[in-house]
């Protein structure tokens, strides 16, 4: 039908053109004696007739008073041009309809549309300005909406916010309500027919399906767009017109808010089923009020749908700011009477028109009779301008088009019954009286009105996103370039002129030339002026280049079905017709139809999920919201075309060609040569693969999980303990090396680097980048001087120069170790062994060293080894110098290569004084850069184990308690105590693998011979209670002697003259401050180690029973709890006593056997252990003041609150031997600062400890009762006697936290029946 077919151009016209309605809008055919819509009005008396100016070259074409700019839309039977009114300079849209393409019924609908548009004068409805008609053509001049369709706006910008959608929807409602009050039903409301002006106000266009209705009477014509059509239309029932519009309004609102259709389907039947079901999805972002409104508009029963009055009063419509314009328009609609309310005439506009030379009486008559001629058009345009600009700046009236009375067929019929003149033109030529080409006068300002158009940027944006529903231009509507070149004597045509300029100016009133004289040749005569006949592409496609619009021809389902039946069955014309496109002359910068090129819109158009891709050059990839199914026949044809020219056939042809090329007989020589090359290539590939495998095993190019081979080849080191924690080959590490454990930030402490090795009171020297290492500063100290405190601060360790020295673990009995120290007192036990590289001496020192650690430790060997093993093994051994860490972490067996002289000559960089041959090598420690290069020239390799990775997440540098923890205290937070998952700086796995490989080659023969003997010696002494016998001798040792114990080497070496000099922590930094302002050595504030690791046995109150004889001497940094108030606790800032511990607390906590100095716990020579700090950090928090320990995400979580104001007894929860995996997980409940992976890893270590303690440690569980009792006694402030006997039980407090941890990881004892996975890691 014409209305439907032309509606495509109408929508485009509206969108780009101001919405000139769907099809041509014009008056019914003028009956004799009745006024008709004048095309070109005959010259009226008094009308100015200025002479035509001389020819000045090609100028834009004119239609009446309108100068054509460009084509902005095409439909099946209509073309829409944008034009500029010559008088008012207003932009208009002119829809040109070919009547010859319309049947009788559709022509009547177009007349009805024009009649209805004349009745509608609303700010949100496209205005009809003028109607011109010839014998073949109908010209509808309508308002131009420069903002385009809301459909395009949604495609370009996505769905609207409800506030914006509410504003648009209110304008739509006022316009539809106005129509209903006029008894007009639109019946084709959809996003494509909602246009936007320059100010983004709504303009409803396309009244091609509109009709008049009588309230209470039902309509029965099926029309509209299927996705927007009400269910009663799909059912074929008679329907209430306004209720159909209300359903469509509900769909429109859904589209505005959601950017999608509520009902859509790939075929019309699917769409019909969905609409009839009435079910649609409500997105999560839609408000409840909006959902309520939509649901009550999209009701299947028309009688239950909301009315327009109810919609206007709905809660959602009332939201937001007040809208006086909406209220006013609704009030006007309600006050409308049946007769049309005529606005009073604007006298200013009438005077302006009279000044222009237009007869006032003629204008008044035109307005009263609704002639919609150029008089009424000028009046309406001037009224619109006056409303917008409050001014009427008009130029001189151009030469008025004259009615042309052609000699033969053309006649002018002036109907006296009305003022309008109807000009009958039997054949519309390219140049006709109404379309004469007139050059504008030089006095006219051709610039358009300001405000009429959006900014150029907006226009470019609009043009770039606009897509039209029509296809290529009809060749019959455009003049091709070759024809233009054939015209003799005329310059090139301006491409912007849609009509060829044949004569510079033809004034038909002066010379009524015959038609053949107007044109040099007859080539330009179109025998049929079928401007509106759609190209074959469109007729066959039925969809246009964008797929069928909702209301394009196919919107009438019967007509659409007929078109489908008439389509050819052959190859699709979608491809075959494209070669005709280049023949069309582009008439402007954007081609004749104004479409942007395909690539310009794809970026924004692909966001539509309902995209139908067809193989046509000009096909837009975005379907309209209202597009139905793609043409099945066209798709079939497309498939046939694909079958004919498919890529499969091309591949087959290529295959045949290859067979022809290479399928023949090949020369034997060539074949043999090819075969040899192939074999060489295979060998080379195989060699490369082998090389890669070898490289991966030695030096993996990228971080990878620890190599199992390295672990398997690694000889068992010191004890069963090391091997019991050995991860089974089937257990992958809990974290891939690419995880945070192997990242290397510049300021995060590595899990096993300087922050790890240092004592809790010390910090990595790397924080002071400009300061020399402590080894360089204090290396030459006198023997009797205690080492100055470590100058390093928090463990933000910078990378230390990598000196890959093989570090061997020296296990000495305590007396041997002390005697080997330069400052060892003469009273030390005779068990000391002279420092010599012999293996036997190394074994003895190994045992004595281990026994020393056992005797001064505070927990069972199993737990101690678990913690230390994980700690040592996860060291980034080749990056962080032990010189940066307090040596309280460095037991002699850990760093045998470090000469451990007396504290006076203490230098972490120097070896402890044991040659490498004296100690068993521990792979992870072999890489510490500060070990003397002489120790080992071949840097060993070691791959970190899963347990290490899990345990050793570094402490975050910005660790804080309730308030900020001082940087000094952060030094106490070694990575294993703050398993927060922070990244750390480590040696890459590649270097680890290399070091391991070299180390294994050196150690295999030497250590395999020593393993069994060491195991036997170690456990024989352990079982015999060697550690217990060491305690009495230690009582007589000087502080210098005991300082040599690496696990006691805290960097806070203070000449404490009073208990207050123990460790200074500034209260303003949220840690309670001891009374002494600064340590004697100016020891920097070291962060208290908030001990979040369950492996650390924190009950420092048990320290006294570990062989400490003197209850009066206290060393707050050793496991033996000291009298000095240095035991750091997690108490709040207001709890200095609970945080730092007082003398009474230290007395409660235990007796230290280091000499008999009550207050000189940190004398010069004293190298206290870090363990009490650990214990108190976690256990001595004041009640209700849980310390916030940040996890790896930066989220604080509280540390364990203390049960007691002072130190909390740990009871069995922390000290009993775990018997099974369940116990291990129970233990994890009390690890506030531990990450889950680390906790599970610890549980694995504890489960290994269970077997260990049962088989090797003589009833550690049995000793726990006494141990706990003693712990309670120490809490009570009682001094403990010598507990050397108890130390033989090796209970949970028998070992310092820095015991040989790395010994634990390389062996899995046969008794351990679970892997790391089973243990929960």
Curated annotation (Swiss-Prot):
Protein name per Swiss-Prot or TrEMBL: Serine/threonine-protein kinase SIK3
Function: Positive regulator of mTOR signaling that functions by triggering the degradation of DEPTOR, an mTOR inhibitor. Involved in the dynamic regulation of mTOR signaling in chondrocyte differentiation during skeletogenesis. Negatively regulates cAMP signaling pathway possibly by acting on CRTC2/TORC2 and CRTC3/TORC3. Prevents HDAC4 translocation to the nucleus.
Compartment(s) of residence: Cytoplasm
Residue stretches of biased makeup (Polar residues): 600-613, 763-772, 935-945, 1256-1265
EC number(s) per entry: 2.7.11.1
Transmembrane segments: none
Biased composition (Low complexity): 36-47, 896-909
Biased composition (Acidic residues): 587-598
Impact reported for residue 1161 to V: In a breast cancer sample; somatic mutation
Entry comment on modification after translation: Phosphorylated at Thr-221 by STK11/LKB1 in complex with STE20-related adapter-alpha (STRADA) pseudo kinase and CAB39. Phosphorylation at Thr-221 is inhibited in response to PTHLH/PTHrP. Phosphorylated at Thr-469 and Ser-551 in response to cAMP signaling.
Enzyme class: transferase
Sequence positions bearing Omega-N-methylarginine: 986
Binding site for ATP: 72-80, 95
Record-linked InterPro entries: Kinase-like_dom_sf (IPR011009), Prot_kinase_dom (IPR000719), Protein_kinase_ATP_BS (IPR017441), Ser/Thr_kinase_AS (IPR008271), SIK (IPR034672), UBA (IPR015940)
Family designation: Belongs to the protein kinase superfamily. CAMK Ser/Thr protein kinase family. SNF1 subfamily.
Gene name linked to the record: SIK3
Record PTM Phosphoserine, positions in chain: 551, 591-592, 626, 647, 866, 978
SUPFAM superfamilies given in the database record: Protein kinase-like (PK-like)
Domain UBA: 344-384
Residue stretches making up the Protein kinase domain: 66-317
Organism: Homo sapiens (Human)
Lineage of origin: Eukaryota, Metazoa, Chordata, Craniata, Vertebrata
């Amino acid at each position: 039908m014409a209305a439907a077919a032309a509606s495509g151009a109408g929508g485009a016209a509206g969108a780009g053109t101001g919405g000139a309605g769907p099809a041509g809008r014009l008056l019914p055919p003028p009956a004799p004696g009745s006024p008709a819509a004048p095309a070109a009005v005959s010259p009226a008396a008094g009308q100015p007739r200025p002479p035509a100016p001389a020819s000045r070259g090609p100028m834009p074409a004119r239609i009446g008073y309108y100068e054509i700019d460009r084509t902005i839309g095409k439909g099946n039977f209509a073309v829409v041009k944008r034009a500029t009114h010559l008088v008012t300079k207003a932009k208009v849209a002119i829809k040109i309809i070919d009547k010859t393409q319309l049947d009788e019924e559709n022509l009547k609908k177009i007349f009805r549309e024009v009649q209805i548009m004349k009745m509608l004068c609303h700010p949100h409805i496209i205005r009809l300005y003028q109607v011109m008609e010839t014998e073949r053509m109908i010209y509808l001049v309508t308002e131009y909406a420069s903002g385009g369709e809301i459909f395009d706006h949604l495609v370009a910008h996505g769905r609207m916010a409800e506030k914006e959608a509410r504003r648009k929807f209110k304008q739509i409602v006022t316009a539809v309500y106005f129509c209903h009050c006029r008894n007009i039903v639109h019946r084709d409301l959809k996003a494509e027919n909602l246009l936007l002006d320059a100010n983004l106000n709504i303009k409803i266009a396309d009244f091609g399906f509109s009709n008049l209705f009588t309230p209470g009477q039902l309509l029965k014509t099926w029309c509209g767009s299927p996705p927007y059509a009400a269910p009663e239309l799909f059912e074929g029932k008679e329907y209430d017109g306004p209720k159909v519009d209300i359903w469509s309004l509900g769909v429109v609102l859904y589209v505005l808010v959601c950017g999608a259709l509520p009902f859509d389907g790939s075929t019309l039947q699917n769409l019909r089923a969905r609409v009839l079901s009435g079910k649609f999805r409500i997105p999560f972002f839609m408000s409840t009020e909006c959902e309520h409104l939509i649901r009550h508009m999209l009701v299947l029963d028309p009688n239950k749908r909301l009315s327009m009055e109810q919609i206007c009063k709905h809660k959602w419509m009332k939201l937001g700011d007040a809208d006086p314009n909406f209220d006013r328009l609704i009030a006007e609609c309600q006050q409308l009477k049946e007769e049309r309310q005529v606005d009073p005439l604007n006298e200013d506009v009438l005077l302006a028109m009279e000044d222009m030379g237009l007869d006032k009486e003629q204008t008044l008559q035109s307005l009263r009779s609704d002639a919609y001629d150029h008089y009424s058009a000028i009046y309406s345009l001037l009224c619109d301008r006056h409303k917008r600009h409050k001014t009427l700046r008009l130029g001189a009236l151009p030469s008025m088009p004259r009615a042309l009375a052609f000699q033969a067929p053309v006649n002018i019929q002036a109907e006296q019954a009305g003022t309008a003149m109807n000009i009958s033109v039997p054949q519309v030529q390219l140049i006709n009286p109404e379309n004469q080409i007139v050059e504008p006068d030089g006095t006219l300002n051709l610039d358009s009105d300001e405000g009429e158009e959006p900014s150029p940027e907006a226009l470019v944006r609009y043009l770039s996103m606009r897509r039209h529903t029509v296809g290529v231009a009809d060749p019959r509507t455009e003049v091709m370039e070759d024809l233009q070149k054939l015209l003799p004597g005329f310059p090139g045509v301006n491409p912007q002129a849609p009509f060829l300029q044949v004569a510079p100016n033809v004034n038909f009133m002066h010379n009524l030339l015959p038609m053949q004289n107007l044109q040099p040749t007859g080539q330009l005569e179109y025998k049929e002026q079928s401007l509106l006949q759609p190209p074959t592409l469109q007729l066959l496609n039925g969809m246009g280049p964008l797929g069928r619009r909702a209301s394009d021809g196919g919107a009438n389902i019967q007509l659409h079905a007929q078109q489908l039946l008439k389509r050819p069955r052959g190859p699709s014309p979608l491809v075959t017709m494209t070669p005709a496109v280049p023949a069309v002359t582009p008439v402007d910068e954007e081609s004749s139809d104004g479409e942007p090129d395909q690539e310009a819109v794809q970026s924004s158009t692909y966001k539509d999920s309902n995209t139908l891709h067809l193989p046509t050059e000009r096909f837009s990839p975005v379907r309209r919201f209202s597009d139905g199914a793609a043409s099945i026949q066209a798709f079939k044809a497309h498939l046939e075309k694909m079958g004919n020219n498919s890529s499969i056939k091309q591949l087959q042809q290529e295959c045949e060609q290859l067979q022809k090329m290479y399928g023949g007989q090949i020369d034997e020589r060539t074949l043999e040569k090819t075969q040899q090359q192939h074999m060489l290539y295979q060998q080379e590939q195989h060699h490369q693969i082998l090389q890669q495998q070898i490289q991966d095993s030695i030096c993996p190019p990228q971080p990878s999980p620890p190599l199992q081979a390295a672990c398997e080849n690694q000889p068992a080191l010191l004890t069963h303990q090391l091997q019991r924690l050995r991860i089974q080959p089937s257990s992958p590490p809990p974290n891939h090396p690419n995880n945070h454990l192997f990242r290397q930030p510049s300021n995060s402490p590595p899990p096993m680097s300087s922050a790890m090795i240092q004592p809790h009171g010390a910090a990595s020297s790397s924080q002071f980048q400009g300061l020399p290492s402590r080894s360089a500063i204090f290396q030459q100290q006198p023997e009797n001087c205690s080492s100055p405190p470590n100058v390093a601060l928090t463990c933000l360790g910078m990378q230390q120069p990598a000196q890959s020295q093989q570090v061997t673990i020296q296990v000495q009995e305590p007396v041997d170790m002390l005697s080997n120290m330069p400052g060892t007192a003469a009273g030390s036990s005779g068990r000391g062994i002279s420092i010599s590289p012999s293996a036997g001496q190394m074994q003895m020192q190994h045992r004595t060293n281990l026994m020393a650690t056992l005797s001064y430790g505070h927990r069972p060997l199993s737990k101690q080894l678990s913690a230390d093993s994980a700690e040592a093994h996860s060291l980034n051994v080749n990056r962080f110098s032990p010189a940066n860490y307090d040596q309280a972490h460095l037991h002699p067996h850990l760093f045998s290569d470090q000469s451990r002289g007396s504290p006076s000559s203490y230098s972490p960089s120097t070896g402890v004084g044991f040659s490498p041959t004296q100690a068993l090598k521990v792979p992870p420690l072999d890489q510490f850069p500060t070990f003397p290069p002489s120790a080992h020239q071949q840097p060993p390799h070691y791959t970190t184990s899963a347990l290490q990775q899990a345990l050793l997440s570094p402490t975050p540098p910005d660790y804080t308690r309730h308030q900020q923890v001082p940087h000094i205290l952060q030094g106490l937070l070694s990575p294993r105590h703050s398993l927060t998952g922070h990244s750390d700086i480590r040696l890459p796995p590649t270097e680890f693998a290399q070091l391991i490989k070299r180390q294994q080659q050196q150690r295999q023969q030497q250590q395999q011979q020593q393993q069994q003997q060491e195991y036997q010696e170690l456990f024989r002494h352990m079982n015999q209670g060697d550690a217990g016998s060491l305690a009495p001798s230690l009582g007589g040792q000087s502080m210098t002697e005991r300082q040599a114990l690496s696990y006691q080497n805290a960097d806070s070496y203070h000449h404490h003259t009073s208990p207050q000099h123990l460790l200074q922590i500034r209260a303003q930094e949220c840690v309670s401050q001891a009374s002494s302002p600064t340590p004697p050595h100016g020891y920097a504030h070291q962060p208290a180690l908030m001990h979040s690791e369950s492996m650390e046995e924190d009950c420092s109150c048990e320290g006294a029973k570990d062989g400490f004889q003197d209850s009066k001497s206290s060393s707050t940094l050793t496991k033996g709890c000291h009298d000095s108030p240095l035991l750091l606790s997690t108490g709040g800032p207001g709890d200095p006593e609970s945080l730092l511990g007082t003398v009474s607390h230290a007395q409660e906590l235990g007796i230290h056997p280091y000499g008999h100095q009550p207050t000189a716990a940190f004398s010069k020579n004293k190298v206290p252990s870090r363990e009490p700090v650990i214990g108190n950090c976690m256990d001595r928090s004041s009640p209700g003041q849980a310390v916030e320990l940040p996890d790896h995400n930066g989220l604080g979580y509280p540390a364990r609150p203390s049960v007691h104001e002072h130190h909390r007894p740990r009871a069995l929860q922390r000290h009993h031997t775990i018997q099974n995996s369940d116990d291990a997980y129970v233990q994890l409940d009390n690890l506030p600062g531990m990450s889950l992976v680390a906790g599970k890893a610890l549980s694995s270590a504890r489960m290994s400890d269970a077997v260990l303690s049962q088989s090797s440690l003589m009833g550690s569980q049995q000793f726990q009762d006494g141990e706990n009792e003693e712990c309670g006694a120490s809490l009570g402030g009682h001094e403990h006697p010598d507990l050397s006997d108890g130390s033989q039980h090796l209970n949970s407090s028998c070992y310092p936290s820095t015991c040989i941890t790395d010994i634990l990881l390389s062996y899995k004892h046969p008794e351990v029946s679970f892997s790391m996975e089973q243990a929960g890691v």
